[in-house]
């Protein structure tokens, strides 16, 4: 099992924290275990409350069913169903940008 460094950032929220996330753990779950309060709703990849935007690195979010190909191509990620596949930086609280 690999462990990656995931940096979660959001200037408006005053968030800039790096956490270690195993490659079989969803980023949202690891953030909560680290004491971070990120937005979420369904926890099943079927809404956009937990949306973030990848600034660097890669994730596996094949369990999600909400984002379309264009949104994924633009770097959007649903943190509740995203596993890290490399060290990555994700800007959080991006739901409003999807619409």
From Swiss-Prot:
- Enumerate the GO terms in the molecular function aspect: 2 iron, 2 sulfur cluster binding; electron transfer activity; metal ion binding
Residues binding [2Fe-2S] cluster are: 42, 47, 50, 80
| GO biological processes | electron transport chain
Query: What protein family does this chain belong to?
Result: Belongs to the 2Fe2S plant-type ferredoxin family.
> Where in this chain does the record put each 2Fe-2S ferredoxin-type domain?
4-96
This protein's species is: Chlorogloeopsis fritschii
Q: What Pfam family is a match, any one?
A: Fer2
Q: What does this protein do?
A: Ferredoxins are iron-sulfur proteins that transfer electrons in a wide variety of metabolic reactions.
Entries under PROSITE patterns matching the protein? 2FE2S_FER_1, 2FE2S_FER_2
Q: Which UniProt keywords apply?
A: 2Fe-2S, Electron transport, Iron, Iron-sulfur, Metal-binding, Transport
| Protein's recorded name | Ferredoxin
Q: Which cofactor does it need?
A: [2Fe-2S] cluster
Q: What does the entry comment about cofactor binding?
A: Binds 1 [2Fe-2S] cluster.
Indicate whether Iron-sulfur appears among the record's keywords: yes
Q: Please give the InterPro entries that the UniProt record associates with this protein.
A: 2Fe-2S_ferredoxin-like_sf, 2Fe-2S_ferredoxin-type, 2Fe2S_fd_BS, Beta-grasp_dom_sf, Fd_pln
């Amino acid at each position: 099992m690999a462990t990656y460094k995931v940096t979660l950032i959001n200037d408006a929220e005053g968030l800039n924290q790096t956490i270690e996330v195993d490659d079989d753990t969803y980023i949202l779950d690891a953030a909560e275990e680290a004491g971070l309060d990120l937005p979420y709703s369904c926890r099943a990849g079927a809404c956009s409350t937990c949306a973030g935007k990848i600034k660097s690195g890669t994730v596996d979010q094949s369990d999600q069913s909400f984002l379309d190909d264009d949104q994924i191509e633009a770097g959007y990620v649903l943190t509740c169903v995203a596993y890290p596949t490399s060290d990555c930086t994700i800007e959080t609280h991006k739901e409003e940008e999807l619409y």
